[in-house]
Amino acid sequence: CLRKGIKNGVLKIVITRGIGGRGYKFEKEIVPTVIFLSFPSREINKKALNTGVKLRFCEFPIFENSMLAGLKHLNRIDSVMARSEWEEDEFFDGVMLDNSESIIDGTMTNLFFSKNKVLYTPIIKKSGINGIMRQVVIDNAKLFFKEVYEIEIKKKTISTYDDMFVTNSVIKILPVTHLSNKKFKITNATREMINFFFKKSKRSKNLELI
């Protein structure tokens, strides 16, 4: 970042097994490859922040593997296939379901829903990523909501929720106004949380949130 002159940006760290031969077996003394990728920060889309974004459901299901659930690994072919389902800019992200039609996460985001000022997020047990901002929101949720729960959320139940927002470590938090045919309002609690995190990240560059 310093060499590129990036004062405010994103640092992505990728770790692979390392260079080896063919096949799945690898030598114990193999040296992992660590790749550092730096990018300038994107300008915050103020319109999306104020008026919200639209999401859609993906047809391609998320893969289930309880041993890897929560980890952001490189074997994300399910997310790649799901993201290929649309080209238009109308949708910010796609929501992925497991084989029992439980909502898990987006192709690049974690998901939160609220009802009566109680916050809910899909539980990460068999699939999905426990993202950095997901955990930060869970840890700070009671500043704005009465309670926060990690639960199983079925696709058929989304009409019962008042609002929705998405998170990841780059966008932080964005409110959602539409998920397919379901319309959400942006509640005061969600708006207060968004303002809190953006003000705090400007002061500390996110370090105190992690």
Report the location of each language-model feature:
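Helix-start/capping segments and mature chain N-termini
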Residues: L2-R3, T16, G21-I210
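ATP-grasp fold ATP-binding core
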Residues: N8-I15
